[in-house]
Design a protein with these regions (language model features):
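PAPS-dependent sulfation machinery
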Residues: 1-67
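PAPS-dependent sulfotransferase catalytic domain
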Residues: 39-65, 71-156
Length: 156
């Protein structure tokens, strides 16, 4: 988690969360239903986000800025991202799963405790995280290997 403030930079999930339920208060439940989450067409969401970024850039006189989308949610929707951000360059920063999965599970536990307030089945939460993000990685790999995929680089 990080500091929040009205004038501070924020992750893309806030602007994208206007269109799809990827905010922490809802997404921690949706990980339990990957078939639902993976079926969403978020092309319109990315178009809306692109427009918001363009507005921010124009307002600051920095139209040529590069933007970084860092949420792991983008793994699921690379095919839609590619449709909207046609000149994007994807740099996929790989973290060791033995570090990243516990980190995600801890984050999702915090969300569940904040919004559900009940006892959390940690074993079930761990299984859900492993299954969901494993499927997300496979989907992203497939999307980036597809004909016509954007230029991308893997960084470890």
């Amino acid at each position: 988690m990080h500091e929040l403030g009205a004038l501070e930079p924020e992750e893309c999930i806030l602007s994208m969360g206007v269109d799809v339920p990827i905010l922490p208060c809802t997404f921690h439940l949706l990980v339990q239903q990957p078939e639902v989450v993976f079926a969403w067409d978020v092309s319109g969401t990315y178009a809306h986000h692109r427009d918001q970024l363009s507005l921010l850039a124009r307002r600051n006189g920095t139209e040529r800025l590069r933007w970084m989308l860092k949420s792991p949610v983008h793994l699921i929707y690379v095919r839609h991202l590619q449709q909207v951000f046609k000149d994007a360059k994807i740099v996929w920063n790989h973290r060791d799963p033995s570090q990243s999965l516990p980190s995600l599970a801890s984050l999702f536990r915090a969300f569940a405790e904040m919004f559900e307030g009940a006892d959390i089945d940690l074993a079930a939460l761990g299984r859900e995280q492993l299954a969901f993000w494993s499927a997300a990685l496979r989907r992203c790999d497939d999307d980036l290997a597809a004909p016509g995929a954007l230029d991308h680089a893997h960084v470890k």
